[in-house]
Amino acid sequence: MAALRRLVSGCGRQLQAFLAGPAATGWLWLPARGLREVVKIQEGKTTVIEGRITETPKATPDPPNPSGQCPICRWNLKHKYTYEDVLLLSQFIRPYGGMLPRRVTGLCREEHRKIEECVKMAHRAGLLPNHRPQLPEGCLPKDKPKLNRYLTRWAPKSVKPIYKKGHRWNKVGMAVGSPLLKDNVCYSRRPLKMMH
């Protein structure tokens, strides 16, 4: 039985070497064809349609600001992203939702802190539902706690609401968002409010 197992494993190794070897590239992998442009030529009653090979574009386009010290500065995105830009944020997080370290992402300190804050806000808003650790089999997720409208660490039932926050023109505001994002570009007519 052991001899048969050795024979099968040896044949498997030889087959792998044959498939991965340089001779296999000719029939296993086809060469890249390049981009083709469809050209229509009419000569009298005949119409010839042919595909001419065009130059292939660059794999990665050049950034507008190549002297920037981090990817966000290089692409001029410094004050132009928020917690809602999930595609941008997902490049800097692990599959389970944690932030990648600065040495991996190549971000400067300021942008790393801003991205970290945006990732936290996106998690809280529920915009990154797939980026969380998977539960072991057989475990059921706990029910989400009800929203604590009073923003305190005590149970909402034990808290007395604040009925008077002041007159409308002099109300005590509630902090919303992050002060790190206060310099962001605002495209709406209303200015960005950090206190609601």
Swiss-Prot record:
PANTHER family: 30S RIBOSOMAL PROTEIN S18, LARGE RIBOSOMAL SUBUNIT PROTEIN ML66. It comes from Mus musculus. Its main location: mitochondrion. InterPro entries: Ribosomal_bS18, Ribosomal_bS18_sf. Keywords: Mitochondrion, Ribonucleoprotein, Ribosomal protein, Transit peptide. Coiled coil: none annotated. Pfam families: Ribosomal_S18. One of its GO terms (cellular component) is mitochondrial small ribosomal subunit. Component of the mitochondrial ribosome small subunit (28S) which comprises a 12S rRNA and about 30 distinct proteins. One of its GO terms (biological process) is mitochondrial translation. It is found in: Mitochondrion. This is Large ribosomal subunit protein mL66. GO terms for molecular function: structural constituent of ribosome. Residues 1-34 form a transit peptide. Belongs to the bacterial ribosomal protein bS18 family. Mitochondrion-specific ribosomal protein mL66 subfamily.
